[in-house]
Regions:
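Gly/Ser-rich "nucleophile elbow"/oxyanion-hole loop immediately N-terminal to the catalytic nucleophile
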Residues: 86, 97-119
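Short amphipathic alpha-helix adjacent to the substrate-entry channel of hydrolases
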Residues: 53-71
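N-terminal cap/lid segment of alpha/beta-hydrolase-fold proteins
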Residues: 1-35
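Cap/lid segment of the alpha/beta-hydrolase catalytic domain
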Residues: 47-55, 72-87
Length: 125
C-alpha cells in the first residue's frame, strides 16, 4: 500500500490555505488499461470544527479493499481557517482537479472520480 500526505494548495499548508490530503493507494491493476483504478475522495464530518478520524481512514481502507484509490481530504475547519462559503467547497473542487491532474502518477482513471461525505463533509459535496 502507498500512503502519501500532501498540502492541497501548495508545497506546505499555510494559514490562508490550510487544507491537506492523504493519498492511500494500491499498485496498478495488471488487468486494467494502464492499470488505472477508480478514485474516491472522502470528506469526513465534524460540524466544521474538526474532522472526525473515524470517518476518514477506515472508510478509505474499505474503498481500497474494493479496488479504489482513496484520498482523504482535510478541508478547512473553524480550527484551521474560514469555513464560510465557498472555502470548504473550494478545497473539494481543488481536490477533484488534483486527483485528475495526477491520474497517471496515482494510477487513477480520471473519468471515474467520486466523492463521499459524512455530515459536514457531505454538505460540501
Amino acid at each position: 500500500m502507498i500512503v502519501e500526505n500532501h498540502a492541497l494548495w501548495g508545497e506546505e499548508p499555510t494559514e490562508d490555505y490550510p487544507a491537506t490530503f492523504t493519498y492511500l493507494g494500491a499498485e496498478p491493476l495488471p488487468d486494467k488499461p494502464n492499470g488505472r483504478r477508480p478514485a474516491v475522495i472522502i470528506c469526513g464530518g465534524g460540524a466544521f470544527t474538526h474532522i472526525a478520524p473515524h470517518e476518514q481512514d477506515p472508510v478509505a481502507f474499505a474503498f481500497l479493499d474494493h479496488g479504489y484509490q482513496a484520498f482523504v481530504l482535510n478541508y478547512v475547519t473553524s480550527s484551521t481557517g474560514d469555513v464560510s462559503f465557498p472555502h470548504p467547497q473550494a478545497d473539494l473542487a481543488k481536490m477533484v482537479a488534483t486527483v485528475r491532474a495526477n491520474a497517471d502518477e496515482w494510477h487513477v482513471d480520471p473519468k471515474r472520480v467520486c466523492v463521499v461525505g459524512f455530515s459536514a463533509g457531505g454538505m460540501i459535496c
